[in-house]
């Protein structure tokens, strides 16, 4: 008896290979991708690279994302298959098979599919794991010997997670058979449908959600809110997309039908009436295609932008090859800031002169900064970080050009001469008062202009406004700094910084050696000096970590983008099959009411194209609306090249549209095979 059930199960899979082969292949790819991600997450070699913790977090995020989307997608695909097979199951029931016998056949089918997908997926994952780790090493610029290994924990986790998934699909299938009577099963997916109603309220809510998501993406400027509101905007756009496809499309089509002049035209009559039913059946799937397409565009374009602009990001974050910082919590009595800075610079120059590097250029300056909240024309201490916070940089007139190169060239008026009681204020927003109050001491504002600020863009991206308060001398600078210290518990946490920046001639290895020598020297001598602390920052020392982090993001972006694209392709494929079965009957009906074969073909082909290209059009709109928010997120990652971001996004969109069109044309073959001689 068991042999009969097994033979019947294998025959069913073979007879429905058009449905099952894509299901097994997509499951295999999902499983292979999950195994590879688990393998990379557990890799001992990757645990030794600089920035390994960040890379592990990225890989962990990838594992979770693949698992979640695998469950969603494979459940969707399974539900489509079981819906199409209900008639077949109903015939078995009518012919005398009890539901428990049908359940046994379905169990064998599910077990066969699961074993085929899991086994082939793990084998493919193992075979491709070395290739993927080589690709990752190439991206993150790591040179290391790679041995072929198999991760036992990755294999076990993959079997457990996807074994549970296929078991849940079996439970779903058995429930569908158990709860349906034979007549319902025989009707399968051909149950008569009523004309969908115009649900204005749902359509308006959908439009409101979409408008709300767009508004947040376009108008959010507070850096502290960008990340949190990004997810709010994403949620609103997803909800809005589904509601608009489900209800908004019906509302628009019915409004067109009410326009008698438009509707009673042979070009529009069949198309509009057909689209009403077509959108009712396909709205959810089309919304899913739209959301997944948007995910592909956003994930790939942003990670590509970050990876391509990596050197620019590195130079933006670390403008000099080597920077030496020393700071003071309080200025010691009798300390002359100029003397302390010159002494530190002389010591640094001596160490560099004794190395294999030569000084290309250097600069040194003293400054301190305050985190404040601007209320009108006043700057007040930050009480909480929910406010729009700003950064004030205090620096002398003689050293402002060192800290902000090109500032004087950008100003309409040159920085005026200042005295001990006057300052100049330059920032991302203009300061309009003639007097500025700094910790209860008033200063006359000799000049104030709005100008671009590039200093420390990594930090600047976190603030709503960045301002330079330019003073006449270091004596005034020290006076204002000491005013802050005198406030006790009410003081604004800050440090007075001496910074020395070097650009050097020499190899990366030589520059790293200089940075280590400087770090060692100042660590040994910091106890003897009056400084509160110091550190040495090297662009080359941080290059590896930057490459690992952004390279890891690029890798995961391409990986997830590929997965989202595959899911999109499979949904399009199954939608084409669904359209084919539905349109086969539509062709017959439309020909019976007097339409010629050419008219029928033209009408239905235009409907199918409209249905399948609506998602990509709306996805492009989503990407355009998301651009301002994505740009701010990328600025927080030091990518300030807007032109590069636009080029990467446009290139990603063009490539995706081309792939989408090719997929549509290829999957259309399945549609035309089903429709057959009707066309």
Question: Whereabouts are the PLM-identified features?
Answer:
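Juxtamembrane interface at the cytosolic side of transmembrane helices
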Residues: 76, 84, 176, 222, ...
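Hydrophobic alpha-helical transmembrane segments of multi-pass inner-membrane transport and secretion
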Residues: 17-45, 53-90, 110-124, 238, ...
């Amino acid at each position: 008896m068991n042999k009969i059930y097994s033979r019947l199960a294998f025959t069913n899979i073979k007879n429905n290979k058009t449905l099952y082969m894509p299901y097994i292949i997509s499951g295999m790819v999902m499983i292979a991708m999950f195994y590879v991600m688990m393998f990379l997450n557990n890799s001992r070699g990757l645990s030794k690279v600089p920035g390994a913790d960040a890379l592990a977090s990225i890989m962990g995020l990838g594992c979770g994302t693949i698992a979640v989307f695998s469950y969603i997608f494979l459940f969707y695909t399974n539900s489509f298959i079981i819906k199409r097979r209900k008639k077949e199951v109903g015939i078995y029931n009518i012919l005398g098979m009890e539901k428990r016998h049908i359940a046994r056949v379905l169990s064998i089918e599910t077990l066969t599919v699961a074993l085929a997908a899991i086994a082939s997926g793990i084998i493919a994952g193992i075979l491709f794991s070395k290739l993927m780790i080589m690709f990752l090493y190439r991206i993150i610029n790591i040179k290391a010997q790679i041995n072929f290994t198999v991760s036992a924990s990755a294999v076990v986790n993959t079997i457990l997670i996807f074994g549970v998934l296929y078991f849940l699909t079996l439970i779903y299938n058995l429930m569908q058979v158990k709860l349906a009577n034979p007549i319902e099963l025989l009707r399968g997916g051909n149950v008569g449908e009523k004309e969908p109603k115009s649900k204005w309220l749902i359509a308006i809510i959908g439009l409101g959600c979409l408008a709300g998501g767009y508004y947040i993406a376009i108008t959010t400027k507070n850096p502290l809110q960008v990340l949190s509101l990004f997810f709010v905007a994403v949620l609103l756009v997803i909800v809005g997309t589904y509601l608009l496809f489900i209800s908004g499309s019906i509302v628009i089509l019915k409004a067109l039908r009410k326009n008698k002049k438009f509707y009673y035209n042979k070009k529009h009559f069949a198309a509009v009436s057909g689209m009403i039913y077509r959108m009712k059946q396909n709205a959810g799937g089309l919304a899913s295609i739209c959301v997944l397409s948007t995910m592909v565009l956003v994930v790939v374009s942003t990670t590509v932008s970050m990876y391509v602009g990596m050197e620019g990001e590195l130079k933006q974050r670390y403008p000099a090859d080597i920077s030496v910082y020393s700071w003071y919590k309080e200025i010691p009595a009798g300390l002359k800031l100029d003397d302390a800075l010159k002494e530190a610079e002389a010591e640094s120059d001596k160490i560099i002169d004794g190395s294999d590097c030569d000084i290309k250029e250097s600069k040194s300056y003293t400054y301190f900064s305050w985190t404040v909240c601007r209320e009108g024309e006043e700057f007040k201490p930050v009480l909480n970080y929910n406010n729009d916070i700003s950064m004030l940089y205090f620096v002398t007139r003689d050293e402002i050009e060192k800290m902000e190169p090109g500032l004087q060239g950008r100003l309409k008026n040159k920085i005026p001469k200042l005295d001990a009681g006057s300052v100049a204020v330059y920032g991302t927003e203009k300061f309009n008062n003639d007097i500025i109050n700094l910790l209860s001491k008033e200063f006359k504002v000799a000049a104030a202009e709005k100008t671009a600020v590039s200093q420390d863009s990594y930090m600047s991206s976190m603030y709503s406004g960045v301002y330079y308060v330019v003073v006449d001398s270091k004596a005034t600078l020290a006076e204002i700094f000491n005013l802050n210290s005198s406030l006790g518990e009410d003081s604004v946490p800050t440090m007075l910084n001496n910074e020395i920046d070097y650009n050097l001639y020499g190899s990366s290895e030589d520059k790293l050696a200089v940075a280590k020598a400087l770090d060692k020297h100042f660590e040994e001598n910091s106890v003897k000096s009056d400084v509160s602390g110091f550190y040495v920052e090297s662009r080359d020392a941080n290059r590896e970590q930057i490459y690992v982090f952004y390279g890891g993001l690029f890798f995961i972006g391409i990986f997830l983008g590929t997965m989202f694209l595959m899911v999109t392709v499979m949904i399009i494929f199954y939608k084409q099959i669904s359209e084919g079965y539905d349109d086969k009957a539509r062709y017959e009906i439309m020909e019976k009411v007097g339409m010629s074969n050419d008219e029928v073909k033209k009408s239905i082909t235009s409907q199918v194209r409209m249905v399948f290209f609506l998602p990509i059009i709306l996805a492009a709109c989503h990407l355009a609306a998301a651009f301002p928010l994505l740009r701010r997120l990328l600025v927080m990652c030091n990518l300030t090249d807007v032109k590069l971001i636009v080029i990467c996004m446009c290139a990603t969109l063009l490539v995706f549209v081309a792939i989408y069109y090719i997929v549509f044309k290829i999957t259309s073959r399945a549609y035309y095979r089903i429709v057959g001689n009707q066309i």
